[in-house]
Amino acid sequence: MAAAPSASGRRSMSWGSSISQSFRQAEADDPFGRAASQQGHDDDEENLRWAALEKLPTYDRMRRGVIRTALLHHDGGGDGGGAAAAAKDGRMELVDIQKLAAGNLGRALLDRVFQDDSERFLRRLRDRIDMVGIELPTIEVRYEQLSIQAEVFVGSRALPTLTNAATNVLQGLIGRFGSSNKRTINILQDVSGIIKPSRMTLLLGPPSSGKSTLMRALTGKLDKNLKVSGDITYCGHTFSEFYPERTSAYVSQYDLHNAEMTVRETLDFSGRCLGIGARYDMLAELARRERNAGIKPDPEIDAFMKATAVQGHKTNITTDVTLKALGLDICADIIIGDEMIRGISGGQKKRVTTGEMLTGPARALFMDEISTGLDSSSTFEIVKYIGHLVHVMNETVMISLLQPPPETYNLFDDIILLSEGYIVYHGPRENILEFFENAGFRCPERKGIADFLQEVTSKKDQQQYWYHDQERYRYVSVPEFAQRFKSFHVGQKMQKEMQIPYDKSSTHPAALTTTKYGLSSWESLRAVMSREWLLMKRNSFIYIFKVTQLIILAFMSMTVFLRTKMPSGTISDGTKFLGALTFSLITILFNGFAELQLTIKKLPVFYKHRDFLFFPAWTFGVANILLKVPVSLVEAAVWVVLTYYVMGFAPSAGRFFRQFIAFFVTHQMAMAMFRFLGAILKTMVVANTFGMFVLLIVFIFGGFLISRNDIKPWWIWGYWASPMMYSQQAISINEFLASRWAIPNTDATIDEPTVGKAILKSKGLITSDGGFWISIGALIGFLVVFNILYILALTYLSPGGSSNTIVSDEDSEDKTDMKTRNEQQMSQIVHNNGASNTSATSSIPMSGSRSTNQQSRSQIVLPFQPLSLCFNHVNYYVDMPTEMKEQGFTESRLQLLSDISGVFRPGVLTALVGVSGAGKTTLMDVLAGRKTSGVIEGDITLSGYPKKQETFARISGYCEQTDIHSPNVTVYESILYSAWLRLSSDVDTNTRKMFVDEVMSLVELDVLRNALVGLPGVSGLSTEQRKRLTIAVELVANPSVIFMDEPTSGLDARAAAIVMRTVRNTVNTGRTVVCTIHQPSIDIFESFDELLLLKRGGQVIYAGELGRHSHKLVEYFEAVPGVPKITEGYNPATWMLEVTSPIAEARLNVNFAEIYANSELYRKNQELIKELSTPPPGYQDLSFPTKYSQNFYSQCIANFWKQYRSYWKNPPYNAMRYLMTLLNGLVFGTVFWQKGTKISSQQDLFNLLGATYAATFFLGAANCITVQPVVSIERTVFYRERAAGMYSSLSYAFAQACVEVIYNILQGILYTIIIYAMIGYDWKADKFFYFMFFIVASFNYFTLFGMMLVACTPSAMLANILISFVLPLWNLFAGFLVVRPLIPIWWRWYYWANPVSWTIYGVVASQFGKNGDVLSVPGGSPTVVKQFLEDNLGMRHSFLGYVVLTHFGYIIVFFFIFGYAIKYFNFQKR
């Protein structure tokens, strides 16, 4: 490979990483291994086949392979059957590699060549490469004097309140005046180091130390707003010389995937897009050298390597390798899912995120917190496999782990310890303890080294590791550690290496990738089109629902505009036809509105793929554009076919098809417009608000609401810029230039020869037939422009959002003077056994107060009742999933828990442990009463009495695995709110607040007191901060029984230690605490008193005490014949999971569940359960006088307090609401400027009627749509809070409705003042206040209707689709497009049922119901305005009282339906 590489040859050549993301290692040997030197395993047939292969031209030879005949007839499935059959059948055949690369044949070959030993297989590959002297490309990554800074607001100025949002806008417009509290935060500070190939590096550090920032910097994925200095090079080359996004792979800690795709489909897509790199060129060179040297490789290894070099297929054998390596093969064909779609588990999603990057050809891997949600055994196997890639295939890998167990830690070669932006240590793992011992700190026995490293730099944890008895402890700061490292021998060696520049000429030509994408543009488009088509099929319900909705609307509209009621030939007849055409047009436009939400939903995954260079952004845009063309064809065809002849439009085939063309192009234009808006606005709340504003502008200047002749000169450009005007013009010309409208015009005021042209001219439309095609051309122009803008937005706009927490002023000061401050001491827990056997008290330890420095404060003592929880023979069943039925399962239900018995006692900390899928969370949900579906069998008692859920909710706490909190409140507000509603009403306000402060100090959230919670992965708190908040929210409830589902998952070792100290202290107060736990370190695991161990299938295999150093657990399992003894210092938790794994069970031929059921331990547990299932003498069943801790009034006040604060800190919702109100008012005011001062003609009155209709409908509709995402997010939080028994559903509904009413009143006042003055309505008090009332009332019922739809549907998306069905109906029967007297009698009831019609009635009747001005009527005699309203519109001033009452009625009805649905509809499936 000395020659200059081709374009493909310059790609990253990590064929090894894509070939073999391998299996967890078992103990089986590979009976099929072959030496590279051609020993005597070849038979004559194999030689003949190989000789035939060698005679083929190079191109054909690379696409053919020789494999055993048995594999060709194997059905795949990965069960090893193909390997076994192939071992018996030695016949060989020549096969097409294209067929081998995908499908069952490839999986059978995979089973055969791997044999569950990834290292051995990789070494066979490496031996083949080394035999012909090919050098694998390697990458060395250097970073020198790298510093990264961010400019951020700190303290209260950083909170996104409405005032801060307004201040930010003003500062952006007029510049900064005075201090803005924006400060420079150092994320990384002058760090340097070398990440070497063939060495696996572990990155450790506490939260906010800069780990993710360092990884993003090294992979070229930093936010452009950050200030960066220093150099980063790959093999001496800077980022400008290659593409770091493809040379390296960054595995993010956030799991962003398409929920509707399966695991296999997700990895197939990433593998297809990332390409094969230089794998094909390397393989061709390998084959050439082997041929010249007369070397014959193992045919099946050869076929396998060729299969991995096939590019562009929908699936590839490398996907199956990755699935096996990450343990995802068991869920390969299950959809990933999300919060609304049931899919794979959180740990499996994390592995999918890792697998996405492993399928590509990158040879430098940077993996950020890949173990979150995984048990320690799975983490060990995955890291071990990656270590094989590093050591055998010379890859470069850096991995950050939160809580690496010792056995995983020992797999790494180098350690980087990062803290406060400084590198404390970077060098070999063997020397790091020596470094800290030189500084005076030693890792204790039975303490994980990784845990020690993350705690030793912390002020609050450092002192416990000081071991110099002769010297007094002194806090060693992080900068001092960093300085000490520079003088340490490892640091000095690193500095010397950094001084020697890397020889760029020695860089392997395939090491750095110089092509931007893995596929050609055409192949990328095909791949994305295939993926988007798959997503459309998976979301087919949405498209079917939209068509069904369109059919219903078409039926309703064609019965309103029935041809028997639609005479033609006069100008007045034309008005009704214009109404029918306009309604059709509005329906088509509204139908395109759903594209807004569909686009925004796809953006997070798109941005990830775009930034990782999966494909060019334009391919995603073009794919979505092309795939929506059939949607427009179907929906336009459905509407036109159903309505055209029934409504009585011009009976001509040509005009029928021309209307279809107009509606098709309009629908395409609408979807393009909303796609573009979604791409630039990015969030549902902002996009919904602005989308409705754009729709309003398009509608106002569409040519129907106000004719061109009546538009003010300063707005005439808006008329020509409105796409709806061209649509209106096209369909109007198509209709009114038909022969039946060619009747001579008799109206002298309009100078046109025919009635049809007179109608067109009265609306300011073109009167020639050529205008139709001009309008179609203009619409196509809009369509093209919107699509181009959409693609440009996708290409150049950043994702937006921030995952940074707010830095408090105090925290900022702390970091400045940290060296000079003394450590604050944590006060000890105070135990109080209480005055009786059935009561106890708790107190919370306080850390030193900032304000008083080291002065301790008094502790709050709150009473609680110790309780034991017993469960006996518990079983849990769910309906058999559809996927399993399709695979042949015949049972009607699936058992998830099988005969589980146990007891949780006061003062005993119990660990609930098991591998993923063992049923830990399921059991906890069952015991806590959180299951919403399925069948539960068995006995559950609380201190001897049957558990009553309502009572149990009052005295229990549940820290869920997913941290669900209201995003727009602060940490302190979240905790105070929980305490307010869950502590007894006897606790006064001051005591409650002090208790909250103590809990916050206990879990170290006091520094984050005023930080916004935010949305996970988008804004606000980090994962570990959010986890601590979850625990604090439950602790302030002062519960007797606490369930914690993986409280340490997602936390680093130090944060996990903080949490476990908190948990231990809680148990010591006499509470009953049980925790599920995934990957505990030794010290965390041994902080538990008892263990309940589950195996897959929900069966108990151990329940009992751990004992000192876990000796009771170890003795129990070591007594089982064949179980290997635990080695000294090994983590008992890891050992326990390994020796009880399904593989170990199969090897020992035992069933640990049966062994436990027949053990003495089981009998003792049954005796204990029997004892505790009987109430103690004199003990009464737990009961409370009220269902909730607080009365209904207090619940309402607390809920309103939280909602008010949440709304105040939600500018994207409320600031946008008021901004759009202001813009709407100004637009209406200037378009209809002083139209209300003089009404002399029918057109004047209809202009005002149109203004009233549009002013009411569009802003109200915007409120209805934009409130839905807000309510949907809060509803998820509501489900958790309701399950905790915090409040009644009605108090929650009342509070949310009240806060909306307040904002709506202010919105209505602002809107009324603007448009009332600018339009020029009569300034009389009664008219003004009537107008204001109807506007405010309409905003309220629109908003409540949107809230009601969310409460009645499982998702905001479905509610949004329903809105697009209801709003056109309200629009149709509002009394504007068709006035009430002209509505067919069979639909007139809907006019009275339509709230919008009542609002228009109220506004028009209150403003003009007593108007005595003379009104000229075309074709009729003059009349007064009052009489015209009564005769033609059916509106009377005397009816206003009923109109007012009806508005109150709608508000009350919508509120009560919202409250009822919130209470009785539960769409959370658990």
Curated annotation (Swiss-Prot):
Signal peptide: none
Alphabetic keyword roster: ATP-binding, Membrane, Nucleotide-binding, Repeat, Transmembrane, Transmembrane helix, Transport
Single GO molecular function: ATP binding
Membrane topology summary: Multi-pass membrane protein
UniProt: ATP 1 binding residues: 205-212
PROSITE patterns: ABC_TRANSPORTER_2
Protein location: Membrane
Transmembrane annotation, as ranges: 541-561, 577-597, 629-649, 660-680, 686-706, 772-792, 1215-1234, 1249-1271, 1301-1321, 1331-1351, 1359-1379, 1389-1409, 1439-1459
Protein function: May be a general defense protein.
Designated name of the protein: ABC transporter G family member 48
Organism: Oryza sativa subsp. japonica
Classification lineage: Eukaryota, Viridiplantae, Streptophyta, Embryophyta, Tracheophyta
